[in-house]
Amino acid sequence: ALADQSYCIGGPEASESCEKLLREYPSIDFLLRGEGEKADLLFFEAAENAGCDLEKIKEAKPLSMSYFLNGKYVETERVPLIENLDDIPFPYTHEELCGLKERILYYEGSRGCPFSCSYCMSSLDKKVRVFSVERVKKDIDEFLSAEVRLVKFVDRTFNFDKKRTYDLLSYIMEKDNGITEFHFEISLWL
């Protein structure tokens, strides 16, 4: 790590063992917990308001963060989960997508998992939250229009809802452009 740099990390794995991670890696200044669409935004707002002064950011105690302040571990209140995933904007412009044609794009049509496997972090959510079928179809249209080579759905269990799965797979087959491929994680016993 560069001594004159500030480090902020996040993500599902980091969100569940915060204090341990911060103790093991003292070069990390902040650990963002929860969904990045909210936690990251809160961090950047706090940083802007504090003039990017690390101590001022910590003193402001922004939500969904873990850090050490004066040698004491601090974990602020976590922001609630995003209930309506359709509120999250599509992350790309058409031009950006066209520039990613030969890349693999990871896409999330749902969050969570219907199972409660003790070894898996996805069991922490306890329920599945979804982007609406209409929203996913609109996003698929964007991928097809840009001729993205491969879209990997990172949904923990894409086929947890048979009707939804049928609707989306039928749509993909109907709109097939002969270029874009789709990848899904499914459970065979559903």
What positions do the PLM features span?
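Pocket-edge positions in alpha/beta enzyme catalytic cores
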Residues: 32, 77-80, 126-128, 157
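A generic "functional-site adjacency" signal
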Residues: 34-37, 82, 103, 130
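Generic secondary-structure boundary/loop-capping signal
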Residues: 11, 19, 62-64, 79-87, ...
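A generic structural signal for short, non-catalytic loop/turn and secondary-structure boundary residues
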Residues: 58-60, 81, 100, 177
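Short, solvent-exposed loop/turn segments at secondary-structure junctions
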Residues: 13-15, 36-39, 81-82, 114, ...
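Glycine-rich beta-alpha loop elements in corrinoid/cobalamin-binding modules
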Residues: 1-78
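Radical SAM [4Fe-4S] cluster-binding motif and immediate context
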Residues: 86-190
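Active-site donor-binding loop signature of nucleotide-sugar glycosyltransferases
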Residues: 34, 67, 78-81, 90, ...
